[in-house]
């Protein structure tokens, strides 16, 4: 059994966003899924980007504005958002509280993609 502790996972911080790499090829040898816990401070913005993989965001706390391929929606705790592969997506925390969510992607990003997504501030 593999149990991943947030405080022991690789971390990446950028622009009011902290990401914790939980399940991945590099952390547990995952072959089909990557999961990340993301904490976004008020005013934080995940800039528009896209991946070849499918993703979903499961909002744990807070709220924000999600945009996928030009369509915007307010999302909050309890919501799960599906992001099709190659969709341009972003998330903006317009609230006054921290937005926390789990990002799950499949198939797995792979080591090369992990390093591209988790560049300079990589910590473990």
Give the positions of each predicted feature.
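Short beta-strand His + acidic residue motifs that chelate non-heme Fe in jelly-roll/DSBH
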Residues: 47-48, 66-67, 83, 89-95
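A generic "binding-loop/recognition-motif" signal
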Residues: 52, 71, 87-88, 97, ...
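Glycine- and acidic-residue-biased ligand/ion/polar-headgroup-sensing regions
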Residues: 54-55, 59-64
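A short, N-terminal "cap"/entry segment at the start of jelly-roll beta-barrel domains
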Residues: 1-32, 116-124
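Short acidic-glycine-tyrosine-enriched beta hairpin
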Residues: 71-85
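A short hydrophobic beta-strand segment most commonly corresponding to one strand
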Residues: 38, 82, 97-113
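Conserved short histidine dyad/triad with adjacent acidic residue
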Residues: 36-51
């Amino acid at each position: 059994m593999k149990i991943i502790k947030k405080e022991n996972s690789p971390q990446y911080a950028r622009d009011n966003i902290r990401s914790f790499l939980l399940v991945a090829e590099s952390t547990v040898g995952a072959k089909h899924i990557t999961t990340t816990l993301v904490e976004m401070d008020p005013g934080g913005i995940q800039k528009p980007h896209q991946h070849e993989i499918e993703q979903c965001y499961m909002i744990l706390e807070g709220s924000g504005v999600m945009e996928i391929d030009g369509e915007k929606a307010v999302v909050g705790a309890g919501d799960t958002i599906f992001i099709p592969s190659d969709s341009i997506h972003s998330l903006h925390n317009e609230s006054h509280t921290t937005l926390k969510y789990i990002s799950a992607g499949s198939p797995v990003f792979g080591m090369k993609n992990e390093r591209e997504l988790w560049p300079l501030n990589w910590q473990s």
